[in-house]
């Protein structure tokens, strides 16, 4: 069952929100914040390679990083910059630690940001990846765009690209920085070898979380 009271129940602003790709809602007062290792129920945020809301498309994954954390995997084990206790399913991570590189299925091997020449990461070794927090300021360049382009487009409604000299453009206009307006979470499945999760599609906006 899902406890919607932990974070506070999510209330839609109007009935149209339930049928829209844009979520308009607010929360009642909750009992506590999300904690690392909580299992979260949330609306799957990756639709057509962008963050968009689908009311009946719901995932259950474990939270391994909160807003303001940096998350990585080292030899198959999750590491969090602000939390030094075990994260996730240790037995599954033990298996990932031991499996040979050539046995990692190519379709699950590589993780965001999918730029292997720059970041030769895979599900056993990746990161650190910073999880955005509301109010954080990020300087924009080609590197940060690799990690946060979906968030930038979600928060601004603009299309982001880079010019030939590496300048970041928003709807064709130069932009130097961005202030995040939402909190985000990094979630993973306990079946680390076979889980569609934040390692592949990125961050979960707080507003998309249904409960714990």
Locations of regions flagged by a protein language model:
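Soluble "head" domains of membrane/secretory-pathway proteins
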Residues: 1-212
């Amino acid at each position: 069952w899902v406890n919607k009271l932990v974070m506070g129940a999510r209330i839609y602003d109007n009935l149209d929100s339930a049928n829209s790709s844009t979520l308009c809602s607010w929360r009642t007062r909750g009992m506590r914040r999300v904690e690392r290792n909580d299992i979260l129920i949330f609306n799957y945020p990756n639709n057509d390679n962008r963050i968009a809301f689908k009311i009946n498309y719901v995932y259950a994954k474990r939270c391994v990083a909160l807003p303001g954390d940096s998350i990585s995997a080292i030899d198959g084990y999750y590491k969090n910059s602000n939390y030094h206790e075990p994260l996730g399913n240790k037995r599954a991570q033990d298996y990932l630690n031991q499996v040979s590189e050539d046995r990692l299925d190519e379709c699950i091997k590589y993780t965001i940001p999918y730029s292997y020449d720059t970041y030769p990461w895979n599900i056993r070794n990746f990161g650190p990846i910073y999880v955005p927090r509301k109010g954080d300021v990020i300087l924009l360049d080609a590197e940060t765009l690799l990690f946060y382009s979906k968030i930038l487009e979600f928060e601004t409604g603009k299309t982001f690209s880079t010019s030939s000299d590496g300048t970041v453009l928003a709807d064709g206009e130069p932009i130097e920085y961005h202030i995040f307006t939402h909190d985000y979470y990094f979630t993973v499945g306990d079946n680390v070898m076979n889980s569609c999760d934040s390692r592949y599609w990125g961050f979960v906006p707080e507003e998309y979380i249904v409960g714990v």
